[in-house]
């Protein structure tokens, strides 16, 4: 098992290029099931979750060939409508194959994601939507079994905003009979990217990026060539890396408009952000100001940036309050930040962070993907040496982050424990 060793206290400088979006790539890969053809997806990041998705597609009968950041997917040979627990258990997004398989074959059998409690996770919204489109759904032995001669258009109002549910039903509706209307749809940029892919295939979609999406079903879809959007969470993580170290960096291949909520809060904290010719310059302040945040569905402050922003607030000149309104149990990084000397108290979904003058390097353990990034950021700013273990979480969502940070002047290496 690998770990990262960081010698902190270095101001980051230079340029870094953001990889393609993981959260956009996964549903885009899965959408190719809908069209039996040869597809080409570029700007794909090298990540564990991408490899898992490729294995799922191959298990279903697709041929996948990767060359650098370009992946060719041939789905003409897909002849299996079952996604087994052995693969699905490692990645929750795998359940998105259910709708496309059902649309293509009229039946599908997909394992529930590992540790997924139907009532506690919005997968029930996926199933409710498919049922509204005419699917007969049964849960047996940990699998979702679905049948439908042909999915039919329906009006679906999500109880809560769900990115996966919106993506799932948008794919399923692309070849359904009639019009499907998704109300209270999620508005994330990754949904727009998926809609762009489906539209290139021949789908008729209107309203992606708003809370009402209309999909007029077509008889069939064709091949697609598409470049995945940049990863806005990786971009935001590098912006905070510059801020927390008092650095001065340029970030390439990012779309700043996707991070408005974060940008405003960073500016409130004293960070200077300049966007020129699609290159974003980020200069850390001499003093970090305390700023309150509340996570919200897009275009609000992203929950996937909450942990990283908390690391920044640990060194602020005043207290800040962080409210997590999207996910439960998303303060698991707090106890690890306190090992650096951070002053944080939590109550329910709220954390109060009292800034300290400095952090001190410590051995810490990552608990999830974004917590991994948070601990790295703290380590970059801390005195002395920090060791971050269990970084396999990190490899799910960040492509070679230690190499990119080292390229900015960080003293960071990956070693085997």
Curated annotation (Swiss-Prot):
One of its GO terms (biological process) is peptidoglycan biosynthetic process. It is found in: Cytoplasm. Phosphoenolpyruvate binds at residues 22-23. It comes from the Bacteria. Pathway: Cell wall biogenesis; peptidoglycan biosynthesis. Its main location: cytoplasm. This is UDP-N-acetylglucosamine 1-carboxyvinyltransferase. It comes from Geotalea uraniireducens (strain Rf4) (Geobacter uraniireducens). The gene is murA.
